[in-house]
Regions:
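Beta-strand-loop-alpha-helix segment that lines the small-molecule cofactor/substrate pocket
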Residues: 71, 77-129, 144
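N-terminal Rossmann-like dinucleotide-binding module
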Residues: 1-51
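Glycine-rich phosphate/pyrophosphate-binding beta-alpha loops
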Residues: 188, 213, 237-245
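Short, well-ordered coil/turn residues at beta-beta hairpins
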Residues: 75-76, 237, 253
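C-terminal glycine/acidic-rich active-site capping loop/insertion
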Residues: 223, 250, 254-326, 348, ...
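Conserved SAM-binding strand-loop segment of SAM-dependent methyltransferases
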Residues: 53-60
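Predominantly a Rossmann-like dinucleotide-binding segment in NAD(P)-dependent oxidoreductases
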Residues: 10, 128-216, 345
Length: 388
C-alpha cells in the first residue's frame, strides 16, 4: 500500500496526538516520516513513540528540504501556521494546518493566495466537521426543506479550563504568543461550524471580557450578537470559566427549528411554514401544527483520524477533503470581527477592515505580558475534541 510520508512540525499536545493515532494504525495510508520541534525533549519523545531511527529536526525548513516527506502537518503556535504552510507550498509539499488558520485574516489571505498558486493539497484540521450531528444539521439547512434561516443561537460554554491550563506554556493566553483566548484557541471549531452551516453574518456586535475568570490578558468570556444579509439574527456565547458548561446550537427557520445538544439532533417541524401560516391564519392566537422528531444520523464522528485519512485520500487519489485549507479564513473572520468590535466598543461590519484589525492587535502585542519561568506541559488531549 502506498503511503503519504508525513512530516509533523510541532510535537506538542496536538502533534503528539496525531502521532498516537498514526502509531495505532488508525491512518493506514499515512506514515510519520520525520518530525521537527525546537524542544529536544519532544524530539526524544517522538523517537520513543516511533523508533530510534526516526529522522528528527530542530529546524522545520531543514526537514522540508530533506526529501524525506511528501506532506507536512503544521501544529505549532498560531502565528506560525501561515508561515510554515507557505514554506511547504514553496517546496511543493502538501499541507495540513491545525486550527486556527492563523491569527489575523490578512496573514491567512496571503497563505491562501500562495496555496492557489501551488499544485498541492491544502487542508484544515476542522475535525468537528466529521461529527454526525453537525453534518446532518448542515445537510438539512442547505437542502432548503425548512426554508430560510431566521435566527441562530449557540451557547458553547463547556470549554472549561483551570488556571493550570493557562500556566502550561509561556505563549498561552497572551496576545504575543497566541493572539487571542477562547475565540482563537477553543472556538475555531465552533466558529467554523457556525459559518459552515449558517453562512457569515454582515454585522458583528461583540462583548468580550479579558481575564475575567483567569489570570490572563486575553478573552475568556464572550457574548456576541450578529445580523445576516437576509435579516436573520444570531448569538454566540462562550467561556472557559463555566463549569458545568452548556453546548446547545439552535437554528430557527421558516419551517421549523433544529437543536443540536447532547450528541443528538432534534427537529421541530411546522406543518405550514411560519410566513405562509401568518398570512392565511384568521385565529388571533393560532399556531401552526408542530411535530417533534429525533433526526437519525449515521452516528459516525471520525474526528482527527477522519481528517487525516481524507487528506491521504486527496493526495493519493484526488478524493475530497473534510475541509479545504482556504476555508480557514471564514471562522477566523468571525473571531477577528468579535475582537475588533470589543476593542472599538461598537459593532463592525463585514467584510472586515483587516488593516484596522491588525493595527489594534499590534497595540496589544506591544504591551503583552510574556510569561516567564514556565515549565511547558504536554497534555493528553484525547476525549477533549468530540461533539462541541
Amino acid at each position: 500500500m502506498k503511503k503519504v510520508r508525513l512530516g509533523i512540525i510541532g510535537v506538542g499536545n496536538m502533534g503528539s496526538g496525531h502521532i498516537g493515532n498514526i502509531v495505532a494504525d488508525r491512518c493506514p495510508e499515512v506514515e510519520v516520516a520525520a518530525v521537527a520541534d525546537i524542544n529536544p525533549d519532544r524530539l526524544e519523545w517522538a523517537r520513543s513513540a516511533l523508533g530510534d531511527n526516526l529522522p528528527c529536526f530542530d529546524n522545520a525548513e531543514a526537514m522540508m528540504d530533506s526529501g524525506l516527506i511528501d506532506a507536512i502537518l503544521v501544529s505549532v503556535p498560531h502565528y506560525d501556521h501561515p508561515r510554515y504552510a507557505m514554506e511547504g507550498f514553496q517546496r511543493g509539499l502538501h499541507v495540513m494546518v491545525e486550527k486556527p488558520a492563523g491569527v489575523y485574516t490578512a496573514q491567512v489571505r496571503q497563505m491562501n493566495e500562495a496555496a492557489a498558486k501551488a499544485s498541492v493539497v491544502f487542508g484544515m484540521m476542522f475535525n468537528q466537521r466529521t461529527d454526525h450531528v453537525y453534518r446532518k444539521m448542515r445537510a438539512i439547512v442547505k437542502s432548503g426543506e425548512l426554508g430560510a434561516i431566521r435566527r441562530t443561537s449557540w451557547i458553547i460554554t463547556d470549554w472549561y479550563r483551570p488556571q493550570a491550563y493557562y500556566d502550561s506554556g509561556a505563549w498561552r493566553a497572551t496576545w504575543s504568543g497566541e493572539g487571542g483566548g477562547v475565540l482563537l484557541n477553543q472556538c475555531p471549531h465552533n466558529l467554523d461550524l457556525w459559518q459552515w452551516i449558517c453562512g457569515l453574518p454582515v454585522k458583528v456586535d461583540a462583548h468580550l471580557h479579558f481575564g475575567k475568570w483567569h489570570d490572563i490578558e486575553v478573552e475568556d468570556d464572550v457574548t456576541t450578537y450578529v445580523e445576516y444579509e437576509n435579516g436573520a439574527t444570531g448569538t454566540f456565547i462562550t467561556s472557559t470559566g463555566d463549569v458545568p458548561g452548556s453546548n446547545r446550537f439552535e437554528i430557527t427557520l421558516d419551517g421549523g427549528k433544529l437543536v443540536a445538544e447532547g450528541g443528538k439532533l432534534k427537529l421541530w417541524r411546522l406543518g405550514t411554514p411560519e410566513p405562509e401560516f401568518s398570512r392565511i391564519n384568521t385565529v388571533p392566537f393560532g399556531r401552526p401544527e408542530i411535530t417533534v422528531e429525533d433526526v437519525p444520523t449515521d452516528g459516525q464522528s471520525l474526528q482527527h483520524v477522519g481528517v487525516l485519512n481524507a487528506f491521504a485520500g486527496a493526495i493519493l487519489r484526488g478524493e475530497p477533503l473534510v475541509a479545504g485549507g482556504q476555508e480557514g479564513i471564514n471562522g477566523l473572520t468571525l473571531s477577528n470581527a468579535m475582537h475588533l468590535s470589543a476593542w472599538l466598543g461598537r459593532p463592525v461590519t463585514l467584510p472586515l477592515d483587516e488593516k484596522l484589525y491588525y493595527e489594534e492587535l499590534m497595540k496589544r502585542v506591544q504591551t503583552s505580558r510574556r510569561k516567564e519561568n514556565v515549565q511547558a506541559v504536554v497534555a493528553d488531549t484525547s476525549g477533549t475534541y468530540g461533539t462541541r
